[in-house]
């Protein structure tokens, strides 16, 4: 890569970037020709200004905005900079120069360096922007004109001094940097350590000059303070800082908020503070108050009584601004006693008092400097929310944190309550929409319980239940009457094929009694729960699990799976007709059901055992003449009657053991 492509390499390194955006970046010049020299480069591959057209005007605006940002970041004045492009650039990639006017640098070594920034070879940003907007292109300078401009004499950019050579010019520029006033006046005063007689003015300009650096430092501090005071004026030129904008004022956030919520309503008219207002500016105050109420309404779960709205009597900024600040004063920027006193003493004038004084008196008088200094350092510090008093700001901030934490808990609780109320209102709205419209001659249909709707989602409102659905409805009502606070587990997620909500997510609550494990020869079997209505109904077409020859025999005390947990469908249970009074569904009692099943299975197993013994004797007589073979494993099981379920008594006897299973 050649030296002309060095800029492309520099912007690819993150450590070189001062400011970056999605469109352009800012870097420092490797060979600065002044104390401040920065380059603003676009990320798009644009070789030079000769490749620009009207479509790049927005790009130029972005480059100019970044140039202003880097000047503000460095804390220097914008008017002390030259911003523009080289008419004959030597480096590839379009770049905007942001260079200070002092030109005091060791990298300023040749006459070409000076003339490239202080002649027509340097095209200001505004001039290039206007030419591009008018002509849609930038043309090159003729070579003869370029050579003529490079050969121009070295003329100071801050006065009419003409230097014989570059060293004399650099010495003259150092004098301008040390004292912003005229250098010629300082030369006439002379120097007590260096004789000036016999020397020309141009030769004395670059001599060492022992000036009063204390006065210079003091002047620089004053200039810096004035620059900071104009911060609000600069923010008015950048619309990205605006939260709310109108034709007379804007709302923006405070750079160093003294509370959790701190906004400024800045007037666009040039008034320094409230002492310059008269009765004619009352409509302006009304408009600023309206904007303050708008920004307060945008803060959720925070009422207007928690805000202070007013002006500072002796403001720091050179622009009229109305403070809108929450009264918690919980902020890291609250660092000094003067910060607290500026909002909690007579230094802060509420909006109502300022408005009344302008209405009655027509003006507001400023306070004296002595009174202002005394109020700034006033002690003890009193809490604005209780009677707490202390002399240390750190103790006050710790106390204010407790108030803030309590209010935050109340706001969180209020948010939760509002959310619950909103959910309830939405549920009521959905029920109102689902309710059918009443005809003129029809009576209103009584609303059905939620449990019935959940169990029978396909049931239309107003349609009577079938005899098969009535027991299930009555059973569901009895269950939910006992479980007022809800079931112990999510009953809507039980693996019942008749349950339309069986695929819904679980409530992450475990059952108090886990289900009995069902293991088979090929792994665990899927759990089975029978329907909740009586057996032998047309809706129950699910095949119950029958005999499995590959399954290991059950223990003698076990009779098989329980098919119908409903007490009405177990042997001997009464099945009432729809509409008859039925008792509530009995609770599960493992010992009672187990003993009942054993008694039923013992009665049913006796005739089955007699039939099986007869079948086995016939099989043995038919196989006497055959060669004896080892019986297969499945024929060496216990009698079939011990593993059949409750419905085995109604089936045909089992086939002989030497026949193939169906």
UniProtKB/Swiss-Prot annotation:
Database matches in SMART domains: ZnF_C2H2
Compositional bias ranges of the Polar residues kind: 501-513, 560-569, 588-599
Name of this protein: Aprataxin-like protein
Entry-linked InterPro entries: Histidine_triad_CS, HIT-like, HIT-like_sf, Znf-C2HE, Znf_C2H2_type
Biased composition (Low complexity): 490-500, 600-626
One Pfam family hit: zf-C2HE
Function field: DNA-binding protein involved in single-strand DNA break repair, double-strand DNA break repair and base excision repair. Resolves abortive DNA ligation intermediates formed either at base excision sites, or when DNA ligases attempt to repair non-ligatable breaks induced by reactive oxygen species. Catalyzes the release of adenylate groups covalently linked to 5'-phosphate termini, resulting in the production of 5'-phosphate termini that can be efficiently rejoined.
Chain residue ranges for the region called Disordered: 482-662
Key words of the record: DNA damage, DNA repair, DNA-binding, Hydrolase, Metal-binding, Nucleus, Zinc, Zinc-finger
């Amino acid at each position: 890569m050649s030296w002309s492509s060095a800029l492309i390499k520099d912007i690819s390194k993150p450590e070189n970037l001062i400011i970056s955006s999605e469109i352009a970046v800012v870097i420092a010049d490797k060979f600065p020709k002044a104390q401040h020299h920065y380059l603003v480069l676009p990320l798009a591959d644009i070789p030079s200004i000769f490749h620009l057209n009207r479509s790049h005007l927005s790009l130029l605006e972005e480059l100019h905005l970044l140039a202003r940002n880097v000047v503000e970041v460095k804390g220097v004045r914008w008017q002390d900079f030259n911003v523009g492009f080289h008419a004959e650039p030597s480096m590839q990639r379009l770049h905007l120069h942001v260079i200070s006017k002092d030109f005091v640098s060791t990298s300023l070594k040749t006459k070409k360096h000076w003339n490239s920034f202080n002649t027509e070879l340097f095209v200001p940003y505004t001039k290039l922007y206007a030419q591009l907007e008018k002509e849609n292109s930038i043309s090159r300078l003729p070579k003869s004109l370029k050579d003529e401009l490079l050969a121009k004499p070295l003329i100071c950019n801050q006065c009419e001094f003409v230097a014989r050579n570059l060293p004399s010019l650099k010495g003259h520029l150092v004098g301008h940097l040390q004292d912003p006033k005229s250098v010629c006046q300082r030369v006439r005063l002379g120097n007590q350590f260096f004789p000036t007689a016999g020397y020309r003015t141009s030769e004395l300009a670059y001599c060492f000059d022992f000036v009063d650096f204390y006065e210079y430092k003091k002047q620089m501090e004053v200039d810096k303070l004035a620059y900071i005071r104009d911060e609000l004026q600069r923010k008015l030129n950048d619309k990205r800082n605006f939260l709310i904008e109108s034709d007379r004022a804007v709302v923006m956030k405070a750079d160093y908020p003294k509370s959790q919520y701190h906004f400024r309503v800045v007037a666009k008219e040039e008034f320094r503070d409230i002492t310059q207002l008269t009765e004619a500016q009352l409509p302006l105050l009304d408009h600023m108050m309206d904007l303050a109420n708008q920004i307060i309404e945008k803060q959720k779960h925070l009422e207007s009584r928690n805000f202070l709205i007013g002006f500072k009597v002796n403001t720091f900024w050179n622009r009229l601004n109305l403070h809108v600040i929450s009264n918690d004063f919980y902020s890291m920027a609250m660092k000094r006693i003067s910060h607290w006193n500026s909002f909690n003493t007579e230094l802060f004038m509420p909006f109502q008092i300022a408005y009344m004084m302008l209405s009655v008196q027509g003006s507001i008088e400023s306070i004296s400097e002595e009174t202002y200094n005394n109020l700034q350092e006033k002690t003890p510090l009193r809490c604005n929310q209780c009677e707490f008093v202390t002399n240390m700001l750190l103790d006050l901030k710790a106390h204010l944190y407790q108030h803030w934490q309590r209010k935050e808990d109340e706001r969180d609780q209020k948010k939760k309550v509002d959310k619950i109320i909103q959910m309830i209102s939405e549920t009521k709205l959905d029920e109102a929409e689902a309710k059918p419209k009443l005809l003129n001659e029809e009576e209103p249909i009584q609303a059905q319980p939620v449990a019935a709707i959940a169990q029978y989602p396909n049931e239309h409102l107003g349609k009577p239940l079938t005899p098969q659905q009535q027991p299930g409805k009555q059973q569901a009502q009895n269950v939910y009457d006992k479980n007022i606070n809800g079931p112990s587990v999510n009953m809507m997620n039980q693996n019942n094929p008749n349950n339309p909500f069986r695929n819904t997510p679980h409530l992450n609550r475990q059952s108090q009694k886990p289900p009995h494990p069902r293991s088979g020869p090929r792994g665990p079997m899927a759990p089975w729960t029978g329907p909740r209505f009586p057996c032998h109904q047309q809706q129950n077409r699910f095949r119950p699990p029958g005999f499995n020859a590959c399954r290991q025999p059950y223990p003698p005390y076990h009779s098989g799976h329980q098919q119908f947990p409903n007490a009405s469908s177990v042997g001997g249970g009464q099945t009432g007709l729809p509409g008859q009074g039925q008792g509530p569904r009995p609770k599960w009692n493992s010992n009672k059901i187990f003993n009942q099943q054993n008694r039923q299975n013992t009665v049913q197993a006796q005739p089955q055992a007699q039939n099986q013994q007869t079948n086995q004797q016939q099989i043995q007589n038919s196989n006497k003449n055959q060669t004896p073979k080892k019986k297969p494993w499945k024929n060496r099981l216990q009698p079939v009657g011990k593993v059949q379920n409750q419905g085995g008594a109604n089936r045909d006897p089992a086939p002989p053991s030497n026949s193939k299973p169906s």
